[in-house]
Amino acid sequence: YKVKIAAEVKGFSAKEHMDFKAAKRMELFSQYAVAAAKEACADAGLEMEKEDPYRVGGIVGSGIGSLATVEKEYEKILEKGPARVNPLMVPLMISNMAAGNVSIHTGAKGKCTSVVTACASGTNSIGDAFRAIQYGDADVMFAGGSESCICPTGVAGFTALTALTTTEDPLRASIPFDKERSGFVLGEGAGIVVLEELEHAKARGAHIYAEVVGYGSNGDAYHITAPAPGGVQARKCMELA
């Protein structure tokens, strides 16, 4: 592998956030999402037992889901045959299970969807959750993204795409706005926020960090990986917001 650096989550213990049996039925990206959602819920002082669960939803994006599951189960097919594949392979690997598991572990029974837009998945999820509240579909939304694809296939794929930095200096690896930048660092983790309708938040005395006042989303219609030169569509997206 040309790439020598990745941003791993160290010291994560799923059992601190969920029971062992539940954790065994999730891959890391789902575990991270559930842990982050529970932390966000606690930080927001949101008491789900006092909420209408049908007015609380979640939109959690994941660009890839679990490549590690695909690798592991494919090895089983080659070595032991297709009958030995884990019956939970599909629900372990598919991207929407981050949102699904957040719903299960928070008790949110409202809108539950997943956004898959590569590196923009988390931001798009927050924007779509904002819209759900704005349109009156929910009072509260868990929103964000989760990813865990530091595995042979993930590293090889992004390396072949020439998307990752090949520097061996951790201090000079992730420098996106530097003239010497050479790619990004493959990382993992989750980020979840609690979005809430303003009057609903005020009524329960929530500590409000910030207000989302706009959201824009569009596409370049240009190239599968490269942004259009000139940044016209990026500017248009900001204007839409």
Residue spans of the language-model regions?
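Conserved beta-ketoacyl condensing-enzyme motif
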Residues: 1-117, 146-155
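Short loop/turn motifs at secondary-structure junctions
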Residues: 54, 137, 207-208
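A glycine- and small-aliphatic-rich helix-loop capping segment at beta-alpha/alpha-beta transitions
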Residues: 68-82, 132-135, 155-168, 229-233
